[in-house]
Amino acid sequence: MTTSEEVVKASQTATTGGRKFDGDKLQYGLLPPLALKATVEILTFGAKKYEPDNWKHVPDSKRRYFDAMQRHLWAWKEGEQNDPESGKNHLAHALCCLMFLYEHDIMYSVDDNS
């Protein structure tokens, strides 16, 4: 039995003459481009202020980045769009903090508080 996905692939192949089986691969194009750009802007700001990848070496990072994320979320919730120091959106700052927390959670044991 032919699935709808196979029909689409067959019609694309018939039209272009080429094949590429990437249905099970990650689709980075699904990332929201504006949020991604804003996050990279925050990371660049931080790299200039401190140094690239400084976030990996911050003591007590889980607590500190969780607190920073909350501060940015609360500032945004209270109506402040941009961080006064960076001039960048509070939600982008919060996204960076969340990404740092996620990376630390994966890189280190869950019990580690580094």
Model-found features: residue ranges?
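Intrinsically disordered, low-complexity regulatory regions
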Residues: 1-114
